[in-house]
């Protein structure tokens, strides 16, 4: 019996639909970075505005992580899910039709809104249906990585072969519309499978040690994850003086390793406790982070990139599973969790940028060691907390 064998027909349809939506989330995430050079070339915008466009997407995502929890209570999970997912279409259309800075910023913000709310809802729905099954959560995350691998090529092919980057936006908008239709067919919330916690407005989850440990872990992880993804091309270009093709290839290699790692994690997640699995991944991340920032040889650097991708791959989903029972119990726990943890993805890359501006990328990238060490400490505390609960 496969990973989904224990679920009924309606549950399988929901999980399969969320896999597709997570694939789209991967596309949305990488399309932001892939579209900016095309938008800059088309509309002649400045580097400052280009940076603001990327930030607008991140800010929109963080804000909607919290707002989406309240809109689900007010509108119902399905209606809120569909309406907020539709914002990605609004955002893609906005950046397609005009080079007006305000419209571009609004478009990227809407894309961020859709990413934040859709990720929140999808994780919560699958977490509730599977009762925090780490294998299913990791398999869903693998679809995100697959979408992330494909997105840059979709924009590149559209711009080079079809002659217009806008075709990529049109295609992704149609794919998003299909995702909304699939959600309409799902039976959850008020018309089927129960999702969300019983305690709708209760904030007592803030008193739970497991919640804070999981939050600290995801804060450190997202800081490492977004920093590696965001700075890897610049790091290889400037620290190793490689070609753009080689540096871009390293970014693709990183995502390929993440994809393979998530598939592996989905297969072995049930063979050990979630806390211990997170600890093992944290150890691997610490080791390969140390190798990554050491700059010994280019060969070791490439190996460290692969190693980081493999060990980063399953941590995110497992940390969500670690706090899964709390998410099921408290309606607002998911939203606050994603909002607060999102600051890790904002602060860490910015700190690296500030240090790199003064001392070079070789020094700035070493900030990753602090986050990796902190994640390892938090993972050890998490294992101890579980052992204490067992006794």
What is each stretch, according to the model?
Residues 132-133, 139-188:
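Helix-loop-helix hairpin linking two adjacent transmembrane segments in secondary transporters
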Residues 117-130, 313-327:
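Intracellular juxtamembrane helix-capping segments at the cytosolic ends
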Residues 272-319:
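C-terminal transmembrane helical hairpin of 12-TM major facilitator-type secondary transporters
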Residues 44, 76, 97-102, 131, ...:
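Helix-breaking motifs and short loop linkers at transmembrane-helix boundaries and internal kinks
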Residues 32-33, 209-252, 256-259:
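Extracytoplasmic gate region of multi-pass secondary transporters
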Residues 107-142:
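Cytoplasmic helix-loop-helix junction between adjacent transmembrane helices
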Residues 64-76, 261-273, 356-357:
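Helix-to-loop junctions at the C-terminal end of transmembrane segments
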Residues 63-102:
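Conserved MFS/SLC helix-loop-helix module at the cytosolic interface between two early adjacent transmembrane helices
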């Amino acid at each position: 019996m496969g990973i989904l064998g224990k679920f009924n027909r309606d549950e399988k349809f929901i999980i399969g639909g969320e896999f597709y939506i997570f694939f789209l989330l991967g596309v949305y995430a990488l399309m932001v970075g892939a579209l900016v050079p095309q938008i800059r070339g088309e509309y002649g915008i400045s580097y400052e505005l280009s940076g603001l466009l990327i930030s607008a997407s991140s800010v929109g995502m963080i804000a909607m992580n919290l707002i989406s929890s309240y809109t689900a209570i007010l509108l119902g999970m399905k209606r809120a899910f569909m309406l907020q997912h539709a914002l990605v279409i609004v955002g893609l259309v906005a950046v397609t039709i005009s080079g007006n800075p305000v419209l571009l910023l609004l478009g990227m913000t809407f894309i961020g809104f859709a990413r934040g709310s859709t990720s929140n809802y999808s994780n919560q729905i699958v977490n509730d249906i599977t009762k925090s099954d780490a294998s299913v959560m990791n398999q869903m995350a693998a679809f995100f990585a697959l979408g992330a691998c494909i997105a840059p090529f979709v924009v590149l092919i559209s711009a080079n072969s079809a002659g217009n980057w806008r075709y990529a936006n049109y295609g992704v908008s149609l794919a998003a519309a299909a995702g909304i239709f699939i959600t309409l067919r799902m039976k959850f919330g008020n018309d089927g499978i129960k999702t969300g916690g019983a305690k709708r407005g209760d904030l007592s989850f803030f008193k739970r040690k497991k919640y804070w440990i999981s939050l600290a872990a995801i804060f450190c992880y997202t800081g490492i994850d977004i920093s590696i993804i965001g700075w890897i091309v610049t790091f290889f270009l400037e620290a190793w003086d490689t070609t753009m093709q080689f540096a871009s290839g390293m970014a693709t290699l990183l995502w390929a390793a993440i994809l393979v790692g998530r598939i592996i994690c989905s297969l072995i997640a049930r063979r050990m406790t979630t806390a211990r699995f997170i600890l093992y991944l944290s150890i691997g991340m610490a080791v390969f982070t140390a190798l990554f920032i050491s700059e010994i040889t280019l060969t070791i650097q490439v190996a460290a990139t692969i190693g980081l991708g493999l060990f980063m791959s399953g941590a995110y989903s497992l940390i969500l599973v670690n706090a899964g029972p709390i998410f099921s119990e408290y309606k607002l726990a998911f939203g606050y969790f994603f909002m607060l943890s999102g600051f890790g993805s904002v602060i860490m890359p910015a700190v690296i940028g500030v240090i790199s501006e003064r001392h070079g990328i070789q020094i700035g990238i070493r900030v990753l060691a602090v986050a990796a060490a902190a994640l390892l400490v938090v993972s050890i505390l998490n294992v101890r907390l579980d052992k204490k609960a067992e006794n």
